[in-house]
Swiss-Prot record:
GO CC term, one of those recorded: plasma membrane
Cytoplasmic side: 1-44, 102-104, 154-160, 213-256, 309-329, 394-401, 452-469, 561-582
Pfam (any one): MFS_1
Family, per entry: Belongs to the major facilitator superfamily.
Membrane topology of this protein: Multi-pass membrane protein
Function noted in UniProt: Transporter required for vacuolar uptake of basic amino acids.
Protein name: Vacuolar basic amino acid transporter 5
PANTHER family: AZOLE RESISTANCE PROTEIN 1-RELATED (PTHR23501:SF198), MAJOR FACILITATOR SUPERFAMILY (PTHR23501)
Transport found in the keyword field: yes
Gene from which the chain derives: VBA5
Length: 582
């Protein structure tokens, strides 16, 4: 097999898949007119079911825990999905750069649908978690690729609006998810929370295949080419044409196998330590300490390997596709890492707020899953409004950092107000405190991704691959924050609840695990102002205090973000992309 080297933007775009051009205008592969809007609609549908799978789970936790009897494992209904979602984001970006966007997205949808089917048919908590993990593998690709594809179909000026449109899928799912999930759980069965992904995913595949033309080929021509390739395949031909040494080098260096393995193992061990601490094992036990310390060390070593050791072992330094997943030139660039830390911190706090806002109404007021989900409508409506406003403002005025700071300020104020939500607060307070966190995330997330993309040097030969990987890294940080938010919030709640119950010496709860305490509470509800109701309220408030800390750190990073603005062309300039003046 011949050695592949790249020396021009055209060759780089070929390495990224021919549909990976940064300059959408003038690319034969980019949809135009109605096809563009339908293609964006298909990507939005894909992101909708991806987000739905995160948010709908919050409404089934108590029902599933009661059916399978493992409340402490319910945290893994979120983590089992969001952890592979985070870890594999970078891999999907690299995978798409090799085989192209279209094939990667279709594969990701199929994996996601398979995971949803497994979860829907689950007969035990472990099987349900396994289905969530499989769905998370596919969901990781969907989140990464939808933003990459959407951003590369239009010019730079229209990217903020596209990012906002795609982000609205998450916000709409946050409204619909708890309502649909609650309705299914209360009136039908929680299994339909996963069955619903199947028809929506199928529709998204059809729309995408009909509107997105990779290599300027229609879907029928692509199917014909694929059949021809498969029919001409023979093992002897494969054996003679493939250099297995180069194949192994491709796996190790194109996909950064060792860096990925170290990073994944580190994150998994660290999150296991947080999950087991205070539940299965005490915090000072050797098992928990080993998980936490070893997890941190492996993660640090993965960074050392990618930043300093990868190039020393790289057999083909001139091959642009042989590069680490976490490229020091990009990831360690202050302007990029700062805005991605904003994404990570705000998503950590926001996910904790979302999960325990639902738990607040279910555990304290014994609300059904459906009614508890309705309380999230304020936080989601404001998220949609802010996301759209952010995209329009950036497209028209080019502002990025002001929106980032504005979102950070609203996040701190909103998180502070959420600590006022207790079992004695009024209905208006319970609704009002949920408004600002939605505004915060809507403004900040779009601005952070746009700010990161603006740092790419467009005249570099590998600019197209840089664009993919910066976008994938942002998705990685977003998913990692969501994952950590779910685990940490459960850890804080469980530890706080267990300690407070132990000090109160409540006879029905003494000697029970947190799982058993929660189940006993659900089966023997004694009001929102009882002793156990007060303890639950205080424990959930501690989660909200933790979220406030993450928002405060996020605002601090917002203040140090780049001052770069989106360049707005003069009115008499020719529209720069295929979303302009349609």
């Amino acid at each position: 097999m011949e050695e592949t080297k790249y020396s021009s933007q055209q060759e780089i775009e070929g390495a990224c898949g021919s549909d990976a051009s940064l300059n959408a205008r003038g690319s034969n592969d980019s949809p135009m007119g109605l096809s563009l809007y339908l293609c964006l609609a298909s990507l939005t549908l894909v992101l909708f079911i991806t987000a739905l799978d995160i948010l709908i789970v919050g409404t089934i936790i108590d029902v599933v825990a009661e059916q399978f009897g493992n409340y402490s494992k319910t945290g893994w209904l979120v983590t089992g999905y969001s952890l592979p979602n985070a870890i594999l984001s970078l891999i999907w970006g690299r995978f798409a750069s090799i085989i192209g966007f279209q094939h990667s997205l279709i594969l990701a949808i199929l994996i996601f649908e398979a995971g949803s089917l497994i979860a829907a048919l689950a007969s035990s908590m472990n099987m349900l978690i396994f289905g969530r993990v499989v769905a998370g593998v596919g969901g990781s690709g969907l989140q990464t690729l939808c933003f990459v594809i959407g951003c590369t179909m239009v010019g730079e000026r229209s990217r903020p609006l596209v990012i906002s449109i795609l982000s609205c899928a998450f916000a709409v799912a946050a409204i619909v998810g708890p309502i649909i999930g609650g309705a299914f759980t209360t009136h039908v069965t929680w299994r339909w929370c996963f069955y619903i992904n199947l028809p929506i995913g199928g529709l998204a595949i059809i729309m995408f295949l009909l509107t997105y033309k990779a290599e300027n080929k229609g879907i029928l021509q692509q199917i014909k080419d694929a059949i021809g390739t498969i029919s001409s395949f023979t093992f002897s031909k494969f054996r003679h044409q493939v250099n297995f040494k180069r194949l192994m080098n491709g796996i190790i260096f194109k996909f950064d196998f060792f860096g990925f393995a170290l990073c994944s193992a580190g994150l998994v061990l660290f999150l296991l330590g947080l999950t087991f601490g205070g539940n299965k094992y005490s915090w000072n036990s050797g098992q928990v300490i080993t998980y936490l310390v070893l997890g941190v060390l492996l993660f640090i070593f993965s960074l050392v390997y990618d930043f300093f050791l990868f190039d020393k072992f790289n057999p083909e330094p001139d091959n642009i596709s042989y590069r680490p997943l976490l490229l020091r030139r990009l990831v360690a660039k202050p302007a990029i890492i700062i805005v991605n830390m904003v994404t990570f911190l705000l998503c950590t706090g926001y996910n904790g707020q979302m999960i325990y806002s639902v738990q607040f109404f279910q555990l304290i007021f014994a609300s059904s899953a459906w009614k508890a989900g309705l309380h999230l409508i304020p936080i989601v409506i404001t998220n949609v409004i802010a996301a759209i406003a952010s995209g329009v403002i950036t497209k028209k005025l080019g502002l990025v950092k002001p929106l980032l700071i504005f979102g950070g300020v609203l996040g701190v104020i909103g998180a502070g107000l959420m600590t006022l939500m207790t079992n004695t607060s009024t209905k208006s307070t319970q609704i009002g405190v949920l408004l600002l966190p939605g505004f915060s995330l809507g403004f900040a997330l779009q601005a952070s991704l746009m700010s990161a993309q603006l740092q790419i040097t467009k005249d570099r030969p590998e600019a197209a691959m840089d664009f993919i990987e910066v976008t994938a890294f942002n998705t990685f940080m977003k998913s990692l924050g969501t994952t950590l938010g779910g685990v940490l919030s459960t850890t804080v709640f469980s530890a706080s609840f267990h300690n407070k119950v132990s000090r109160a010496h409540l006879e029905p709860y003494e000697g029970k695990t947190v799982d058993d305490m929660i189940l006993y509470r659900l089966q023997n509800y004694d009001g929102s102002h009882s002793t156990i109701g007060n303890i639950l309220s205080d424990s959930i408030k501690n989660v909200f205090w933790m979220d406030l800390g993450f928002y405060a750190l996020g605002f601090l990073f917002c203040s140090f973000s780049s001052n770069k603005k989106l360049i707005i062309p003069k009115k008499d300039d020719t529209p720069e992309d295929n979303l302009e003046d349609k």
